[in-house]
């Protein structure tokens, strides 16, 4: 076992600096995995279709977990230790479709379950949890590209993240609590047009919107006693962009 880069980052929890140290007897995580899949390709005239189904199962032994921590010289020290184990299992469905060079679609969804073998005690004031934190039971994505004429392309993409359990440490709030977050659908749209400047020089102009529906966390902590680790969902709210690219 070794310290990860993120372990060296300093967090702010309840007005205290929080850091992670490794337990003296920390053992490496071990996993045993099994998966099976079926993949089908078919052509129907000008349409090409691909469908994939995959099941997976992973058993984790000596899984890493964090204590709620203790304050030493004004610094909250959280210790990474080994929990008894955990299991992750689920099913992935993925499909692709193409119609000539005019339209391309791709989408996928994963249904999964992530559980500790025994409830994990993560706080002195909050109940132990058997569900692994920050692991939604459902997540998925899609992409679509439409090219009505060769220089012009219209793109649509999105990701879906289901509800998940997230730790919220005391400070800004009165006591530690495990929060069931809402689900998020983050969709983006982009328009691009290619111009031929010279024999081997192309110019592309593009513009679009990211996170069209403004699916964004709305309960951030504030002030000096905030929990800086209480962040989830899409990384940015609705935003607009434009770009220029020259290739040769």
Sequence positions of predicted segments:
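Outer-membrane beta-barrel translocator domains and adjoining extracellular loop/strand segments
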Residues: 2-10, 16-17, 63-71, 112, ...
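Solvent-exposed loop/turn elements at secondary-structure boundaries
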Residues: 4-29, 34, 48-50
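Extracellular loop and loop/strand-boundary signature of outer-membrane beta-barrel proteins
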Residues: 19-25, 76-82, 122-131, 173-179, ...
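Membrane-embedded beta-barrel scaffold of Gram-negative outer-membrane proteins
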Residues: 27-81, 87-89, 204-205
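Residues that define the transmembrane beta-barrel architecture of outer-membrane proteins
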Residues: 30-34, 85-89, 136-140, 183-187, ...
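Gram-negative outer-membrane beta-barrel transporters
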Residues: 50-59, 79-170, 213-216, 245
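C-terminal beta-signal and adjacent terminal beta-strands/loops
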Residues: 59, 151, 159-170, 193-248
């Amino acid at each position: 076992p070794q310290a990860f880069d993120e372990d060296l980052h300093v967090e702010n929890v309840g007005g205290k600096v929080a850091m992670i140290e490794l337990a003296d007897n920390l053992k490496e995580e071990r996993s045993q995995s099994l998966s099976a899949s079926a993949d089908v390709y078919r052509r129907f005239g000008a349409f090409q279709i691909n469908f994939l189904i995959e099941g997976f199962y992973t058993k984790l032994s000596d899984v890493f977990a964090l204590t709620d921590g203790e304050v030493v010289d004004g610094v909250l020290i959280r210790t990474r230790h080994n929990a008894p184990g955990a299991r992750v299992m689920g099913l992935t469905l993925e499909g692709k479709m193409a119609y000539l060079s005019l339209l391309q679609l791709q989408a996928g969804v994963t249904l999964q379950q992530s559980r500790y073998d025994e409830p994990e005690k993560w706080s002195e004031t909050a109940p132990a949890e058997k569900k692994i934190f920050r692991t939604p039971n459902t997540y998925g994505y899609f992409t679509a590209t439409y090219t009505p004429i060769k220089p012009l392309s219209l793109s649509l993409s999105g990701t879906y993240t289901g509800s998940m359990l997230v730790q919220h440490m005391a400070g800004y709030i009165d006591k530690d609590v495990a929060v069931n977050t809402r689900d998020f659908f983050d969709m983006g749209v982009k328009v691009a047009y290619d111009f031929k400047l010279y024999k081997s020089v192309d110019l592309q102009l593009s513009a679009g919107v990211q996170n069209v529906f403004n699916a964004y966390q709305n309960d951030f902590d504030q002030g000096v006693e905030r929990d800086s680790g209480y962040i989830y969902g899409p990384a940015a709210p609705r935003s607009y962009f434009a770009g220029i690219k020259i290739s040769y």
